A protein has these predicted regions:
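Extracellular carbohydrate-recognition regions
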Residues: 13-33
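Extracellular ligand-binding interfaces
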Residues: 51-152, 158, 170-176
């Protein structure tokens, strides 16, 4: 029998933490509702694991030899995992420095969503633990400057184990661990080792970190204005791309039907966008092409060198903003746009018009032909670069029992769902609606689709007045006729349909499987069908580009393929060669 062998050696310049061969006792690997074996893979031995469904976090724990790994010199741990099963899954990797690690303290975690047959690395960054020199004074940030101490940090000199697990799986999943390495040279962050004293304020008048210089950093107003002149000279030397039409389509390529709007067509076995002039169009762009962005300054005044928001000339860049996560959750606070203030100081009082014109030249100089989501309306409506737009279900009440990173899922059976979409789409009339330069519309963003059971279970865990729950129960009544018939299948003991309505406890997923999957499909299809109807009412010739999936299960993907002209994903990786659509259909895809 083959075993796992733990070593610390150089593997192509990387520190191999685990090598799967015959020299180590497999009892070092602890299984939680899972089974494993070492077997031969394509390029050597692998650890083959299958996780069950009886534990909240089934998986394996791999202990360090001699009780610990000293990874002080490294930046991250990388685990290479192959999905050897038939279903896509999201797998988590946790690195612990203490037996008491609890998912928040004394550990760091990352994850990857892996399709069947796909191999992907999970990189877990070793956020350092030491004395918190900031004294907890940094808050309300999406990321921290190598934050030392506190939750989600470890002591890299004392790494004791690596965990691989899947959260609440509804079916068994199988995967292979091909390697576990430490990599990336750790370079101590300047802010916490240079002992800048005092550290506060640490943001300069341009909104930049002040305790370090780098190539391209703006050092003065004169420097800012000099960069304007140098860019103007550079852009003047760049010629327009040859062989393209005004939209950026391939004018010298094959010709197709010109409809006056963007559309899709399969050409030689591959999906393409066809531009309004009938030319092949490969969309390559970026999101957030806008003039300003804001950061909260309330409760953080001491962070900033210059409190520009108090100056009369910069009042147009002061706003009130509402955050949806972290410290400022559900608070409306004063915000300031350093980006806007910089543009005003760089281009003068006509900065909006000057910058809007410049953006299109800048995009073309970078080889880009599309303005993506969340971009400035003034820039888009200049009609010089193709763009996408977005509509939102906005204030639709959520399914109360649902869960998600960005929030709960909207109740698509609530009457306000369609009403809110129509209100959002009405704002596009005379703007992007009917505009040939607008490729189409996304809806919402990175929604909480969960697994194939989540939204159905969320409906059942909601109060009795939840519209989705009412629809689900009506469907069950039509199928089973009596509560007794439902109880027999689900293994439940509801005394009446009203008893089911009042209950907020989820049934056994295995026994209620067919009904849960069926209603999940109903929710997903209602979402995409309704959005499509609303878009086509106002912009019948423009494309529905989907909802920008970040996490998605096959049922939601299949529903999107049924109603979207193009299915969109937000794929947070550099390479999509191994990406596969899991919606059982041949549809055009776009990274949103």
């Amino acid at each position: 029998m083959l075993f796992a062998f733990f070593i610390n050696c150089s593997l192509f310049g990387k520190n191999a933490l685990v090598v799967f061969d015959s020299k180590f006792d497999p009892s070092t690997i602890r299984a939680t509702d899972s089974r494993f074996e070492i077997k031969k893979g394509k390029d050597g031995n692998v650890l083959s694991v299958t996780v069950g469904t009886n534990h909240q976090y089934p998986g394996i724990t791999i202990k360090a030899p001699q009780n610990k790994w000293d990874l002080s010199q490294y930046e991250y741990v990388e685990v290479m995992v192959r999905n050897s099963g038939a279903n896509q899954f999201k797998i988590n990797c946790r690195v612990d420095d203490n037996p008491g690690a609890d998912g928040k303290n004394n550990c760091v975690t990352d994850s990857a969503t892996i399709s069947p047959g796909e191999t992907r690395p999970i990189k877990v960054r070793l956020n350092r633990y030491s004395d918190d020199k900031m004294g907890g004074k940094l808050f309300g940030m999406r990321g921290y400057p190598k934050k030392y101490g506190g939750p989600y940090t470890v002591n890299p000199s004392n790494i004791i184990q690596v965990l691989l697990f899947i959260v609440k799986p509804s079916v068994e999943y199988s995967f292979e661990v091909q390697s576990i390495i430490a990599d990336g040279k750790h370079i101590p962050p300047t802010a916490l080792t240079s002992d800048a004293n005092p550290f506060f304020p640490f943001i300069d008048t341009f909104g930049q970190y002040k305790h370090k210089n780098w190539d391209g950093k703006t050092l003065s107003i004169q420097d800012l204005q000099a960069k304007r002149i140098s860019e103007e000279k550079e852009l003047a030397t760049i010629s327009e791309p040859v062989g393209l039409d005004k939209y950026g389509g391939w004018a010298k390529g094959p010709k197709f039907q010109a409809t006056g709007f963007f559309r899709t067509q399969k050409v030689n076995g591959k999906w393409w966008l066809i531009d309004p002039d009938g030319n092949l169009f490969f969309s390559q762009g970026i999101d957030c092409v806008r003039m300003t962005d804001s950061t909260p300054v309330e409760e953080r005044e001491s962070w900033f060198d210059s409190q520009l928001w108090q100056s009369p000339e910069f009042q147009s860049f002061v706003s009130r903003g509402r955050a949806i996560k972290d410290y400022y959750t559900n608070k409306t606070v004063k915000c300031f746009s350093f980006a806007g203030a910089n543009l005003q100081r760089k281009y003068g009082e006509n900065w909006r018009q000057i910058y809007s014109e410049l953006v299109h030249k800048r995009l073309r100089s970078w080889g880009l032909n599309t303005i993506g989501n969340w971009s400035d309306e003034q820039v888009r409506l200049m009609r010089k670069t193709p763009y996408t737009d977005n509509i939102s279900s906005g204030r639709t009440p959520p399914i109360q029992g649902s869960e998600g990173y960005w929030g709960k899922f909207p109740d698509v059976f609530d009457p306000s769902f369609k009403r809110n979409l129509r209100e959002s789409m009405a704002n596009k009339k005379g703007k992007s609606a009917g505009d040939p330069w607008c490729i189409g519309y996304f809806s919402d963003n990175e929604m909480s689709w969960g697994d194939e059971y989540s939204l159905s279970i969320g409906a059942l865990k909601s109060p009795s007045e939840q519209p989705a729950k009412k629809v689900f129960i009506e469907n069950l009544k039509a199928k089973y006729n009596s509560i007794e018939a439902l109880n027999k299948v689900w293994g439940t003991k509801y005394e009446s349909w009203d008893d089911l309505s009042k209950s907020q406890t989820a049934p056994d997923k295995t026994k209620a499987r067919d009904d849960l999957l069926s209603f999940y499909t109903s929710i997903a299809e209602e979402y995409f069908k309704t959005v499509r109807e609303v878009i086509k009412e106002v912009a019948p010739q423009q494309l529905y580009l989907g909802c920008r999936f970040a996490w998605v299960n096959p049922l939601a993907a299949k529903a999107s393929a049924k109603y979207c002209d193009v299915v969109s994903y937000n794929i947070y990786r550099r390479d999509v060669r191994d990406f596969k659509f899991n919606g059982e259909a041949d549809v055009p895809l776009i990274i949103g």
